[in-house]
Structures are given as C-alpha cells and as structure tokens.
C-alpha cells in the first residue's frame, strides 16, 4: 500500500465497498478439540517449532512475527493457506515500515503429512480460534506443489 497513489487507494476502497458482507457469526467450534491425541501432537510440534517466533500464546511479535491467535487467515473455511505456510514458509516484502522483514522457514522437509495436519489443526483451534480441523489426507496435494 505504501506505493499506491491516493487515486489507487480510493479505487480499491470503492471496489471493496461493493463486495457482499460476510456472515459475522463465528464458525462453529472445531471438532478437533474432541481428538486429544491430534491436539496434543499439534501442541508439541507448535511448542518446539513455532512458539519461539509466534509465542506460546499465539500473539506473535509484530511486525516480524504475526499473531496466529485471532488471525482470520488461520480460521478461514479452507485450510490451504495455513498448510502452504507450514510447508513452504513465507517471506514478506520489505516495506518502509518493515524494511527488514523476517521470513518463516519451510517445514516440508521436517514434518510429515500427519504432523503438518496436527500442527495446523492445533493453530486453527488454539487460543479460541474457530477453524476446522485438518486431515492428513489434505496435505499431500499441496506438498506436490512444492518447487523441486
């Protein structure tokens, strides 16, 4: 946004106002809470691989490390973005307010499909997040998209 002209920002605002409103009701509580073994495995992986940057409470350390607690992109109906971030990692662009962004490392070479599903499920339901659980069967299709 820092490189947009005022006219571009106004055009974007006008466009966004034309989009239909989303349902404001929270998603139903995830059934993952009923699967203690998945949640425990996901919590252990989170504690060892994610908590250093994103915090034990999921609040992160902005702007370098974004919060996962209450993060709408984590609780979207589709878990694709969350799975891909765990597999591929991610690197934010440098901006005026964040000139040296930190990146998230990929975990595709460390975690198997069950572990990816467990940690993503944990993140999607921990800290009162309201995302749905992720099945290990959802991971291989996205793993195939990894660059060689």
What is each residue range found by the language model?
Residues 1-52, 94, 98-148:
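Flexible coil segments in periplasmic/lumen-exposed cytochrome c-class electron-transfer proteins
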Residues 1-3, 64-74, 101-103:
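A cross-kingdom feature marking solvent-exposed beta-strand/loop segments within repeated
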């Amino acid at each position: 946004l820092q490189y947009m002209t005022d006219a571009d920002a106004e055009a974007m605002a006008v466009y966004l106002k034309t989009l239909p409103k989303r349902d404001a009701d929270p998603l139903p509580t995830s059934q993952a809470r009923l699967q203690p073994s998945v949640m425990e495995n996901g919590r252990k992986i989170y504690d060892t691989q994610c908590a250093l940057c994103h915090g034990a409470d999921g609040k992160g350390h902005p702007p370098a490390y974004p919060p996962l607690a209450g993060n709408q992109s984590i609780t979207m109906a589709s878990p694709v973005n969350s799975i891909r971030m765990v597999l591929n990692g991610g690197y934010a662009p440098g901006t005026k307010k964040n000139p040296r962004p930190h990146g998230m490392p990929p975990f595709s070479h460390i975690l198997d499909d069950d572990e990816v599903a467990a940690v993503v499920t944990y993140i999607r339901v921990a800290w009162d997040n309201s995302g749905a659980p992720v099945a290990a069967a959802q991971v291989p299709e996205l793993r195939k998209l990894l660059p060689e």
